[in-house]
A protein has these predicted regions:
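C-terminal catalytic "cap/lid" subdomain
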Residues: 1-195
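Ubiquitous "structural anchor" signal
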Residues: 2, 141, 211-217
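Glycine-rich adenosine-cofactor-binding loop
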Residues: 197-216
């Protein structure tokens, strides 16, 4: 009701009643605020890709995909499609992956038999990470900074998606890379430009001793 009537909600801390609190409202855009407001993740992701040259230029392929999944109660939280139209990737929970593959293989059984679409399988044990921020659409270079950070840290991005509202970017990585992804993305967007690093040096030989003297003289 408050959303439809455009009424702001103010949340106060009972242990700190004099604090400013948090205001939730519809219009929160502020050109001066940070582009990224938060990072979220889903650690039980399976990626299912429907692909084949028989999809190119064919109307209704995605409709059939989502209709078949919805009919079987399978929720999709990520969609990524190439501009060439020869593949569509969807993210589902690991628990839904086998059923999703089964219903999609049944839906496209004729196309698979004719070789127009490849047999549909799931890539399991992945994780989805999303960065969210209202000011992303006003800030150039967010995607470049994000994927540059991941690349420099040796994290492979399996799939990615961005909404037309430009308020979020989602990407899929291996589950083992989830914690590292969250850490490096957080450091890149939320820490200051200058960071304090801890350097550990072992050894007392000539090279090690000279290095320690140089550091001490700085």
């Amino acid at each position: 009701p408050v959303c439809h009537k455009n009424k702001p909600i103010k949340i106060k801390n009972t242990f700190n009643p004099d604090g400013a609190g948090t205001v939730i409202k519809q219009d929160v855009s502020n050109p001066q605020s940070k582009a990224i407001k938060g990072i979220s993740s889903i650690n039980d992701t399976s990626l299912i890709t429907v692909q084949g040259l028989g999809m190119v230029g064919v109307i209704g392929v995605n409709y059939r995909i989502f209709k078949a999944l919805a009919k079987n109660g399978i929720s999709v939280f990520l969609v990524s499609q190439a501009s060439s139209e020869n593949s569509t990737s969807i993210g589902v929970r690991n628990a839904d992956a086998d059923l999703a593959c089964e219903v999609l293989n049944e839906e496209f059984v004729k196309e698979i038999e004719m070789g127009e679409i490849s047999p549909i399988q799931a890539e399991k044990d992945l994780a989805t990470v999303a960065i969210v921020g209202e000011n992303m659409k006003h800030t150039p270079g967010i995607a470049g900074k994000l994927f540059g950070t991941l690349g420099r840290n040796g994290i492979n991005v399996i799939a990615c998606a961005q909404g037309g509202s430009e308020s979020y970017i989602s990407f899929v990585v291996e589950n083992k890379s989830l914690r590292k992804s969250l850490n490096v993305v957080h450091d890149s967007f939320f820490l200051s430009e200058y960071q304090v690093l801890n350097l550990f040096i072992c050894g007392v030989c000539t090279v090690g001793g000279s290095l320690i003297e140089q550091i001490h003289s700085q």
